[in-house]
């Protein structure tokens, strides 16, 4: 690192360049250009190497951020990537999709006055560069056991669990209903944030490490849970949350109203040129209204732009300051032509004489007293009802645990919201009420960040290792 203690002043924060707007609006490719070696080195040099690194503590997996920034600054990429993998199973993913402004970069000492260190982009640079250099995990010292674990779900929690298990000599076999690994990383997050080749490469890495993938396999249909319990020493549930939430709006089942996840999955199948048993949902030429204010809503509005929608509106019931989505994603959406309408609460879906969507009836809101979560409640403004014209409406209200009938006979307790009970403060962390079954990620904590799912998958794997006495 630089000996100049004022390097953070001499070198200002610089984010990667973005592709031109006219290209971004039509292509499903990542919008950020990669850092050059010179850019990554200079930006890493801005780190103050704080004695108490708030960035590290704010990170859910507690990455060794100052240490790998120093290694990146010195050009020691292979050492940096080894260090990043000590805490994170998918650093190239987190570097792309984590809301760094709310996590590591938001906690950076330099953030308020000088601009935070570009931690996420350097994390991405380190891993991408290491893969270019031919890096792969060294498995030569692994002492293999005769233990094997079935992992249900190839999303971030399942992949993280597989990573820890295989590094400790336990054979992970991952089952997933989709044709490619990643879960919503692949089929939910659009390519302009996370290109599909990223997960394809990670699949090759995990396979070479000894992880076995059995794709296009639906538990409860293609394989039974009892078979897995009989054949494997333990089972990990990393099934995520796939039930999309509804608002109970009038006419929300009308033709032209879509839930966010089926819309995004449909688009991914088309982008990846995969066969799909559902028709493609196309927004070309349509006036689209997306209801919601989280990252999924941002994915929907930006996907609609790329599909060629004539007009795209994001309607959210609170103000911009209270949007749950990443500020970076909101900014990108605005640049690409999305119109945001804040303090609007949907009341119902308007339909024409044929029953098809013609608009969304909304009411203006004002923020009132805080709710139990500390967020100010949106309160309707009397007499402010009006209609937003629309040919298509996408509802992006979030996700909740989906029903798993195949799990019911196996004494796995759920909480009142349908989440799997798998406490982390017990003898074997993330063990369920069935001693042989462990769980982690969104299925346990509810819909959350990729990095929190990774964290729980890794910790659940540690619990499994202790349970198996490995």
PLM segments and residue spans:
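A conserved FAD-binding loop/helix module that cradles the flavin
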Residues: 300, 443-469
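FAD-site-proximal beta/loop scaffold in flavoenzymes
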Residues: 253-285, 370-447
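Local cysteine-cluster metal-coordination motifs and their immediate loop/turn environment
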Residues: 45-64, 89-112
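Feature captures the FAD/FMN-dependent oxidoreductase FAD-binding
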Residues: 79, 143-152, 200-249, 348-357, ...
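Ferredoxin-type iron-sulfur electron-transfer modules in oxidoreductases and energy-metabolism complexes
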Residues: 24-42, 64-96, 113-143, 268
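Beta1-alpha1 glycine-rich phosphate/pyrophosphate-binding loop at the start
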Residues: 6-33, 62-74, 83-85, 112, ...
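Residue-level detector of alpha-helix initiation sites
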Residues: 89, 155-156, 294-296, 443-444
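Glycine-rich dinucleotide-binding loop and its adjacent helix/turn
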Residues: 126-143, 204-221, 244-307, 416-428, ...
